Curated annotation (Swiss-Prot):
Record GO terms (molecular function): DNA binding; zinc ion binding
Protein name (Swiss-Prot/TrEMBL): Recombination protein RecR
Encoding gene (name): recR
C4-type zinc finger span: 57-72
Family assignment from sequence similarity: Belongs to the RecR family.
Keyword hit for Zinc: yes
Record InterPro entries: DNA_Rcmb_RecR (IPR000093), Rcmb_RecR (IPR023627), Rcmb_RecR_Znf (IPR015967), TOPRIM_dom (IPR006171), TOPRIM_RecR (IPR034137)
Function of the protein: May play a role in DNA repair. It seems to be involved in an RecBC-independent recombinational process of DNA repair. It may act with RecF and RecO.
PANTHER family assigned to the protein according to its UniProt record, in alphabetical order: RECOMBINATION PROTEIN RECR
Species name: Histophilus somni (strain 2336) (Haemophilus somnus)
GO annotation terms (biological process): DNA recombination; DNA repair
Keyword Zinc: yes
Toprim domain sequence ranges: 81-176
Keywords: DNA damage, DNA recombination, DNA repair, Metal-binding, Zinc, Zinc-finger
HAMAP family in alphabetical order: RecR (MF_00017)
Length: 201
């Protein structure tokens, strides 16, 4: 029990962050109050501004302060003919960092999960359907997570693409660079064998 209701309230609200339990939240609160009050004020200001001004791109649904994000506004990207479907906005920077993709994106904000009441409409597949109908795509790359839900979501979207005669592909899953076979789980190794490629000399 804290001596200050305000401190208790701060600790409780810090727990909304992923991976932050009671002890971590308490350490954060004490650190801000004891050593970095100016940092705490800056954090509060940044949070308030971000929560009030950041919305979703009307095309790809990623986070942006404008109606359309920088990637969707890029003419080179618009004419690429490639669309990459991801589960979360945080997946976009990860793919961009590789430098291997120069097309556009569509963010699902989750994956299909009927048991949790998450169907096609809840992850924006009606909006994706409209994009497939009205925009010209050569290929749709499915970059959902390698989970049961992610695979089910990818299969559902693949069927949508087939209806529009659009080429569809799935990102490869397999052994990480620098990894050793004996430490790799069976499912990952299985995907690696299925997704093997021929060596060209």
């Amino acid at each position: 029990m804290q001596s200050s209701p305000l401190l208790e309230n701060l600790i409780e609200h810090l727990r909304c962050l992923p991976g932050v339990g009671p002890k971590s939240a308490q350490r954060m609160a004490y650190h801000l109050l004891q050593r970095d009050r100016s940092g705490g004020m800056n954090l509060a200001g940044a949070l308030t501004e971000a929560m009030s001004k950041i919305g979703h791109c009307t095309h790809c649904r990623t986070f942006t302060e404008e109606e359309s994000c920088a990637i969707c506004n890029n003419p080179r990207r618009q004419n690429s003919g490639f669309l990459c479907v991801v589960e979360q906005p945080s997946d976009i920077p990860a793919i961009e960092q590789t430098g291997q993709f120069s097309g556009r994106y569509f963010v699902l904000m989750g994956h299909l999960s009927p048991l949790d009441g998450i169907g096609p409409k809840e992850i924006g597949l009606d909006l994706l359907q409209k994009r497939l109908q009205h925009e010209s795509f050569y290929e749709v790359i499915l970059a959902t997570n390698p989970t049961v839900e992610g695979e089910a979501t990818a299969n559902y979207i693949a069927e949508m693409c087939f209806q529009h005669n659009i080429k569809v592909s799935r990102i490869a899953h397999g052994i990480p660079v620098g990894g050793e076979l004996e430490t790799v789980d069976g499912t990952t190794l299985s995907h690696s064998l299925i997704g093997r490629r021929e060596i060209q000399l």
